[in-house]
Design a protein with these regions (language model features):
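Mature catalytic domains of secreted/periplasmic carbohydrate-active enzymes
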Residues: 1-194
Length: 194
């Protein structure tokens, strides 16, 4: 069972040290605007940032077109796990680790914990599940990375001006949006760990 104690005792496995090369994947809704980086969802709500200016010029103001509005545009039409893994293997990768959920709060897997996931919205596919099955089928090691911990503050810029982050009907997606220096609640920390 996962706990802070069990996590502190975890030792890096030998296979990981021996592998030397693997693929770490950042891919999600933030790829739709394709501007800046995977931190676009945060930066588009930071008044004055390049992403903020780009967003308004390209999509309109954040109270009319927010980050959530990219989800239907994220279709993953060219996502082909078999081809991806074959390419990774050809490159010499021994393991594949996608980000299951980035700081944006959008899960790339089928889950009942949140409606904001790739199976129920956007591509309507269990991206992580499909990739995991193919990685294992082709004999590589599969792992996951969760970046949910920073969701605590990630979209807090949207609380400082008229944006959709302020709309209560999206609280379950935009998250707590606290200040970075605020102490995370034990409930939030356990939510991230588990």
């Amino acid at each position: 069972k996962a706990s802070w104690e069990s996590l502190s005792k975890y030792k890096t496995p030998d296979w990981f040290r021996d592998a030397k090369f693997g693929i770490f994947i950042h891919w999600g809704v933030y790829s739709v605007p394709g501007f800046g980086s995977e931190w676009y969802p945060r930066q588009m709500y930071q008044v004055g940032s390049d992403e903020y200016k780009h967003h308004i010029a390209t999509y309109g103001p954040q109270n009319k077109f927010g980050y959530k509005d990219f989800i239907p545009m994220f279709k993953a039409e060219k996502f082909d796990p078999q081809a991806w893994v074959a390419l990774f293997k050809k490159a010499g990768a021994k393991y594949v680790v996608p980000v299951a959920e980035h700081h944006d709060g959008f899960a790339m897997y089928k889950t009942s914990l949140s409606k904001w996931n790739a199976f129920d919205m956007g591509p309507h596919r269990d991206v992580v599940g499909e990739l995991a099955a193919e990685v294992k089928k082709q004999g590589l090691v599969f792992g996951l990375s969760s970046h949910r911990i920073e969701h605590w503050f990630f979209l807090n810029g949207g609380k400082k001006f008229d944006s959709d982050v302020l709309d209560p009907k999206y609280n379950d997606f935009y998250g707590p949006a606290h200040e970075e220096n605020e102490t995370m609640s034990p409930e939030y920390m356990n939510d991230w760990l588990m």
